[in-house]
Amino acid sequence: KIMKSNNKYFNEGDYVSGWGGVQDYTITNGESFQKINDNKVSKESYLGVLGMPGFTAYFGILREGQIKDGDTVVVSAAAGAVGSVVGQIAKIKGCKVIGIAGGEEKCKYVTEDLKFDYCLDYKNDNFFSELKDKCKDGVDVYFDNVGGNLLNHMLIFISKGARIVICGAISQYNSHKVIGPSNYLSLLVNRASMKGMVVFDYAKDYGMAQKEMRDWILEGKLKSNEDIYEG
């Protein structure tokens, strides 16, 4: 919310979205902010599905993942801000979607609310055997938010021409021993690709992505769930 403005394009009391940092107040010339004039979608959505997490999902799965109708897509951290949107976009585009999340409650949310085809609980003792079973026909796109041992296993299941999108590696961030992939020759055998993506590379297209995802929300095709905390 704008508290004070000397900018002719923004008025005091306007709500905006943009890159302001994790802080109480920011001073800006307005170039990186967009005014929110929307009485159909919540303002909070512009921090989530219509903000940076949503843009990451949109460009990651569509531009980098290059999904097409009939693809099998696996998404790690499927209940998270990015993964939840990735899987829903893949479903909109006609893909079979397998999510990976931690715990029964998250997996239930992924399948019942977000309508993924399957969700595997990585906390289960038989997780890797379940993963092998669900991926036995090959994986066309793996959207990776986790890295580590899971990424290494997913390399075994990729199809010819598969695309692996590296968005994050949350299993490795606080690890004393970084686990790198040893099954990387699968990329060679399957003529597959593994590429990192950074959402800022697509800044010029944010408006287009925001409009399309907003339409999906209004059509009931895309759901979001924001957790709001005070303080």
Question: What residue ranges belong to the model's regions?
Answer:
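Glycine-rich beta-strand-centered segment in the early N-terminal region that forms part
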Residues: 1-22
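A structural motif shared across PLP-dependent enzymes of the aminotransferase-like
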Residues: 19-33, 205
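Short amphipathic alpha-helix with an adjacent loop that forms part of the alpha/beta core around
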Residues: 126-136
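Glycine-rich phosphate-binding loop and adjacent beta-alpha segment
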Residues: 149-222
